[in-house]
From Swiss-Prot:
Compositional bias segments (type: Polar residues): 1-28
Note: Is not encoded in all strains, and seems to be dispensable for replication.
Cellular localization per UniProt: Host mitochondrion inner membrane; Host nucleus; Host cytoplasm, Host cytosol
Recorded name of the encoding gene: PB1
Domain of life of the organism encoding this protein: Viruses
Transmembrane region(s): none
Residues the UniProt record annotates as site (Low pathogenicity): N66
Chain intervals for the UniProt region annotation (Disordered): 1-34
Lineage: Viruses, Riboviria, Orthornavirae, Negarnaviricota, Polyploviricotina
Predominant localisation class: host cell
Cellular-component GO terms for this entry: host cell cytosol; host cell mitochondrial inner membrane; host cell nucleus; membrane
Identification of the protein by name: Protein PB1-F2
Length: 90
């Protein structure tokens, strides 16, 4: 890619690299985000309790090989009911 033709993606990547350099952390060039990177991002910004709940949820989600729409619907409803019960207890 020629200079001066940065896409928003490369600009945001450069910004991230500059921030990392400024804070003294190791600099790395980011690639397009995949599910693991997005997960890492959310885990960094969430509270520890919320983070634990989300880790459990993502592990279950990623363990599904070929989910049907109905099986997903059932799973989500079960998780929602369980989550609401825990909220009321806490």
């Amino acid at each position: 890619m020629e200079q001066g033709q940065d896409t928003p993606w490369t600009q945001s990547t450069e910004h991230t690299n500059i921030q990392k350099r400024g804070s003294g952390q190791q600099t790395q060039r980011l690639e397009h985000p995949n599910s693991t990177r997005l997960m890492d991002h959310y885990l960094r910004i969430m509270s520890p309790v919320g983070m634990h709940k989300q880790i459990v949820y993502w592990k279950q989600w990623l363990s599904l090989k070929n989910p049907t729409q109905e099986s997903l619907k059932t799973r989500v409803l079960k998780r929602w009911k369980l989550f609401n019960k825990q909220e009321w207890i806490n």
